[in-house]
Amino acid sequence: MEPGPGGRGAARGQRPPNAAQPREQERKLEQEKLSGVVKSVHRRLRKKYREVGDFDKIWREHCEDAETLCEYAVAMKNLADNHWAKTCEGEGRIEWCCSVCREYFQNGGKRKALEKDEKRAVLATKTTPALNVHESSKLEGPLTNLSFTSPDFITELLQASGKIRLLDVGSCFNPFLKFEEFLTVGIDIVPAVESVYKCDFLNLQLQQPLQLAQDAIDAFLKQLRNPIDALPGELFHVVVFSLLLSYFPSPYQRWICCKKAHELLVLNGLLLIITPDSSHQNRHAMMMKSWKIAIESLGFKRFKYSKFSHMHLMAFRKTSLKTTSDLVSRNYPGMLYIPQDFNSVEEEEYSNTSCYVRSDLEDEQLAYGFTELPEAPYDSDSGESQASSIPFYELEDPILLLS
């Protein structure tokens, strides 16, 4: 005789399929509440910046607001621990950073990049005999006189043979600490855990590089004192900006961060940038192209680019010891824009209660200032293609909800 409405499952004490729904709804409500805390901080910063215009003053006041910062840090840690980890399997931003570092430092990625540099330099000298000395050296970069058998080249490749020195800016809860290959320094304006140092990266003072052996530099990092107000230049193999740059209300603040990262990295070190975006890859290619041009102008070369369902992930390699940007002929800081930079105060308030989507025409008008960016269909060390001129617009930080 077949079981009745109770069924075998009920006889064995199994829950009906919809029993987990209340728990899932509760989890989503908590996630929305936490993401609301984070987004409200971002919105207030952008609103103040539009009203006042003095990003130094706004940032100083923000860093003094201990209650808001503490609430933000707790919300971010809770989101990362209890929500993002459960909904982003296979798309973890931390795992991506580790994978890129292993590929670059341990599995030949760095060697291949340096070999490409030398081939480009040799090709440039063969195909452009009419160039003067200044133009030629500009094209060839830092590896003009670097042979694969030279001591300098061997030293460069072995520099990170020990632990990879990694600076995690806006670390919150120090997610890289658990990985053995890294000597991690996590910094944040309000740390969520004790292992993260208190530090305002925007106002971090940079000192002369240490003239020490690698093991002595490692020892120096292990003895840092809290809070951190200054650091020597050329100290780290990796600098990570995970969901950091979109926190700042001003493109110039994002620019300052990238410039400081360049100065803190050793030659051929990596800058890893993760920024939120839930749209498909091509829709926001214009912004990514703009960011690439601005960041490379500092003395970087893009090594890798990936698009996950809720974020862009970029790796840039430091290719020159000094920053090279010409801010007179081009507004590179302004090229580090995010969609929210174009919002009005009314639109920010409106986005609290409903989802507003601009028309294609409004998108084109907002992005008009960036339509003349140079084309670069193959624009990275890895030869990845990212060519698109489709404009975009977005109000929120969608990664926070991950719906």
From Swiss-Prot:
Molecular function terms, GO-annotated: methyltransferase activity; protein-containing complex binding; S-adenosyl-L-methionine binding
Comp. bias intervals (Basic and acidic residues): 23-32
Keyword terms: Methyltransferase, S-adenosyl-L-methionine, Transferase
Protein name per Swiss-Prot or TrEMBL: S-adenosylmethionine sensor upstream of mTORC1
Binding site for S-adenosyl-L-methionine: 93, 170, 188, 200-201, 242
Annotated Pfam families: Bmt2
Region (Disordered): 1-32
Compositionally biased region (Low complexity): 11-22
Assembly and oligomerization: Interacts with the GATOR1 complex; interaction is disrupted when SAMTOR binds S-adenosyl-L-methionine. Interacts with the KICSTOR complex; interaction is disrupted when SAMTOR binds S-adenosyl-L-methionine.
Cited InterPro entries: Bmt2/SAMTOR, SAM-dependent_MTases_sf
Family annotation (HAMAP family): BMT2
The keyword Transferase is annotated on this UniProt entry: yes
Start-end of Gly residues biased regions: 1-10
EC number from the UniProt entry: 2.1.1.-
Family: Belongs to the BMT2/SAMTOR family.
Function (record text): S-adenosyl-L-methionine-binding protein that acts as an inhibitor of mTORC1 signaling via interaction with the GATOR1 and KICSTOR complexes. Acts as a sensor of S-adenosyl-L-methionine to signal methionine sufficiency to mTORC1: in presence of methionine, binds S-adenosyl-L-methionine, leading to disrupt interaction with the GATOR1 and KICSTOR complexes and promote mTORC1 signaling. Upon methionine starvation, S-adenosyl-L-methionine levels are reduced, thereby promoting the association with GATOR1 and KICSTOR, leading to inhibit mTORC1 signaling.
Domain of life: Eukaryota
Native source species: Mus musculus (Mouse)
Biological processes per GO annotation: cellular response to amino acid starvation; cellular response to methionine; methylation; positive regulation of TORC1 signaling; regulation of TORC1 signaling
